[in-house]
C-alpha cells in the first residue's frame, strides 16, 4: 500500500533530540498543526484510491493485511493528553507563588532559632514556634486549594465518553463488527444513521447519508455525504466523513484514509494538548505583590542590620534582627485569606451555573476585555425553529421564543391550512416515544434539524401531526436527494369533495417554483404570473438575507380519472405529474438567539468588553444572528452595507469607515498577522464566519497581541485549541464535547452566554474585594514591625512579641479579612472599563503607602501610647526606658531600679513586659476595628455603603471576643505569655481608632468632591 501524500508530516516523531532541538521541533510541530488540513484523498478517483491503499473496493482488506497495518500504525485512538500527576499538582499548591514567601520565612525562623540555640544558654523558643506555624499555614492552605481543584477535576472525569465503540468493516468480503480501535487505514467501513464515524473516511458510495459536523465545524445543519468531489477544501467537500462526527440518517460506505491522531479530529486534540496556557492575571498580580513585600522586607531588614552594627550590636545579634524584621514583614494570614476569598466566589459562581476548574480563573473572567464567542448553542438555542412563513403574498412572523411568549400570526387562512398540511405530511421526522407529558418544544425528535423544526411548529399551531398522518396515509415517497433538491410524497385523501390522492412536495424554493404553474392565494388557485414570481423572489431574498434556511412547498390534487383508488404509483419510473403543480408558500427556519443573550451582550458593551463572534456557519446567518443579539449594533454598517447604500463596488469603500466587519474564513486564510491586527484594532464589532479550528486559534492569538485578556466560549472539539490558548476558556456543560471541557478553565452548566456576564461581574467584584482584604491585612504589619525597630534603635524593652504577632495575623485578623469578600460592589462595576493589567494592579504603590505610611502609622502610635501608659503606671517613665534594654533582658540582674527607685527582679520585669505585649495586641485589635470599617469602601462613604455585610459585623465581634479570651483565659500566661489587662487599658487606643475613621472619611470625601485631583492620584488604591 502506498504511503499517502502528506502522511509523513503528521507522524508523531519519536522524541530523541534534547534541549533546544526538542523545543524548536515542538514549535515547528505546533506551526504545522496550525496550518489548514491538507489531504488529497477527496480528489482521487476510485481507481487511484484502490492503487493508493491496496483495498479491494468490494471485498475490503484481508485480515492478515489489516493486522500488518495495525502493527505499523498503532490503534485507532487519540493519545490521551499528558496529565499532570497528582503529586505534582499538590506540590504546585505547596510551593507556588505566595507559599514560597512563607516557606522562606519559615526557613529563616529555623535558622534564627539555630543561631540562638548555639550561642545562648537558655534560648527563647519564639522563632521555633513561628517557623512551625508558618509551615503549618502553608501546608493546610495548600491542602485546601488542592482539594478545591481536585473536586472540580472529579466532575471533569465524569464527562469522558467521546470515542465510538464499535465499527462495521468489510474484510475478506465479509461484514464484521470490530472494536473501533482496530480499524486501520485502507479498511472498507459501513456507517448508518445513528453511528459515530470511526475514522476519517473517503466515501465511495452513499444512500441519503447526512452527517452532523457541528462538533467539528460548528455548522448546525446536517451535511449531505456522497462520493462526489465538490470542493477543494477537504473540510467542505461531500466525499469525506470525519472521525467522531455523527451519521444522522442514510447509509454510506467509505475507505479509511486516516486513523487516530492523524485524523482531523486527532490533529485538533493534539493541537489543544500541545498549547501552553499562560500565567493567569491573578497569579501575575500575586507575584507582583510578593515582589513589593519582599522588597520592603529586605530594604527594612538590611537598613536595620547596618544600623544595629553602627549601634555596636554583635554580628550574631544583627543577623537575628535582620531575620526578625524580614519575617515580621510576611503577612502570614494573607495566603489563607486569598484562597478562601477565591473559593467563596467559586462557590457563588457555581450556584449561578459557572463551574470554575481552577481558583485563579475566578478573577481572570473579571479582567476579561475581549470575549470570542461561538455561535451555535452558546448565543443561540441550538435547535432549528420556524421563524417566518410567506403565504397569501405576505411574510408572517412565527414565534421563536423559548417559552412561546412571542408574536403569533393569522392561522385562519385556507392557504395556511394547505401549507401546514404539506409541512406535516412531506416530513420524515417523528417524536420519540413516551414524551406526551413534556412540552412540545422540549420533546426529542428522530429526524434532521429542519424537519424537526417543521414538525414542532405544526404540532404547536395545528395539533397532532400523528393524527394528520393517519388521516392522510402515505402511499409512496421520493426522499430528498442532491440532484433533484426536493422531497415528494403521495397520500390518500379522505376529505369528501376532494380527489382521492394528494401529492405534496417541498425543497429548494427556486426548484419548487420552477415546477409550479399556479399559486394558492387565500385558498384559491391563481395562475403564476410575472408579478407573483417577483413577489416570491423578493420574499425569498428577504428571508435568505435574514440568514434563514428557506424551503418552498407545493401540492397537487391528483385527478381521480387518471389515478383511481388502488393505482400503482412507481417512483423509479415516475408515472405521475411532478410539474404544473400549485405553489403554496415558503417557510424559513433559523437557530434563534437565546432569550437572555441580547441583554448579556449589552452588559458586556457597557462594561467595555468587546464581543467577537467566531463561527463555522455561513456569513449571512452569522451576521443575522450577530445583529439579532447586538454584537453588531443598530446603525453600525459593514463595508458591504455601505457599498449597497451608496451603490458603489465594495473595493471603493474605505474599510475604516465601517464600524462593523464580517470576515470570511477563506479571506482570513490569506491574511498576514498585521492585516488581522488592523481589523481587530479598527473595527469595534467583528464577526468571523466559516472559520476552521486553526483559525479560531489565530484569532485568539491576534487579540492577545493587542494586549487583550481573552475569554473564549465554545462547545465543539473544534473550539478546544482556542479554549486552551485563551486567558480563560469557557466550555458548555450540556452540549460541550469532552475535549472542549478538558481544555477549558470554566464550564457553563446551563450553556448560556448570559452566565458569562454573571461570571465577569463576580470576577470584578472579587478583585475589588481582594484589594480591600489585602489593604486591611497589610495595615497591621506596621504596628507589628515598629515595636521591633524601636527596640533595636532606642534600646527599650520589647513592646510586642512574636507569639502575639501570630495571634493577630492568624487569629484576630483572619475572619474580618475574609468577611470583606462578602462586601457588595460600591458602584455599578459593570459600567466601567476592564482593568488594564499593566497599570491597574492588585497591590500598587498607593495601597502600600495608605496601609504602611498612613493608617499603619496611626495604629502604631496607638499601640505605643498603650505601652508607655502601662510602663508609666508600673513606675517606668518613658525617659527612663531609653537604653535600659541590656540590663532589662539580663536574667542575672535582679535589682533594676525604676523612675521611683523601686527595685525589680527579672521575673517581675518580664511579667510587666508580657502584660505590655498583651495590651499592645489588644490596641491593634481596637484600631483594626476602624481599619475594617474604612476598608469596606475605596471611594464611597461608609454611611453611603451601610453596614449590610453581616459577616463583617460578626468579624468585628469575633476578633474582640478572641482578644478578650486570649487576655483573660486562665493559663494563658504559661501557654502564650499573655496576661490579664485592667479594663481601662482597653480604652487607650480608642482615640486613635476614631482618628483613623475620621481621617479616612475626610480623604474619601475629597476624592468624591475632586475626582482626578491630587488626593485621588496619591491615595486611591
From Swiss-Prot:
List of residues binding Mg(2+): 715, 719
GO cellular component: axon; basolateral plasma membrane; melanosome; membrane; plasma membrane; sarcolemma; sodium:potassium-exchanging ATPase complex
Pfam families: Cation_ATPase (PF13246), Cation_ATPase_C (PF00689), Cation_ATPase_N (PF00690), E1-E2_ATPase (PF00122)
Annotated keywords: Acetylation, ATP-binding, Cell membrane, Cell projection, Ion transport, Magnesium, Membrane, Metal-binding, Nucleotide-binding, Phosphoprotein, Potassium, Potassium transport, Sodium, Sodium transport, Sodium/potassium transport, Translocase, Transmembrane, Transmembrane helix, Transport
Intervals, Cytoplasmic compartment: 6-85, 151-286, 337-770, 822-841, 937-949, 1005-1021
Matches recorded under InterPro entries: ATPase_P-typ_cation-transptr_C, ATPase_P-typ_cation-transptr_N, ATPase_P-typ_cyto_dom_N, ATPase_P-typ_P_site, ATPase_P-typ_TM_dom_sf, ATPase_P-typ_transduc_dom_A_sf, Cation_transp_ATPase_P-type, HAD-like_sf
Region of interest: Disordered: 1-36
Residues that make up the propeptide removed upon maturation: 1-5
Cysteines paired by S-S bonds: none
Active-site residues per Swiss-Prot or TrEMBL entry: 374 (4-aspartylphosphate intermediate)
Region (Phosphoinositide-3 kinase binding): 80-82
Annotated membrane topology: Multi-pass membrane protein
Parts of the chain on the Extracellular side: 107-129, 307-318, 791-800, 865-916, 969-983
GO terms assigned for molecular function: ATP binding; ATP hydrolysis activity; metal ion binding; P-type sodium:potassium-exchanging transporter activity
Activity regulation, free text: Specifically inhibited by cardiac glycosides such as digoxin or ouabain.
Region (Mediates interaction with SCN7A), start-end ranges: 594-715
Residues spanning the membrane: 86-106, 130-150, 287-306, 319-336, 771-790, 801-821, 842-864, 917-936, 950-968, 984-1004
Subcellular location: Cell membrane; Basolateral cell membrane; Cell membrane, Sarcolemma; Cell projection, Axon
Residues with PTM Phosphotyrosine: 10, 258, 540
Similarity annotation: Belongs to the cation transport ATPase (P-type) (TC 3.A.3) family. Type IIC subfamily.
Self-association state and partner proteins as the record states: The sodium/potassium-transporting ATPase is composed of a catalytic alpha subunit, an auxiliary non-catalytic beta subunit and an additional regulatory subunit. Interacts with regulatory subunit FXYD1. Interacts with regulatory subunit FXYD3. Interacts with SIK1. Interacts with SLC35G1 and STIM1. Interacts with CLN3; this interaction regulates the sodium/potassium-transporting ATPase complex localization at the plasma membrane.
Protein name: Sodium/potassium-transporting ATPase subunit alpha-1
Organism: Ovis aries
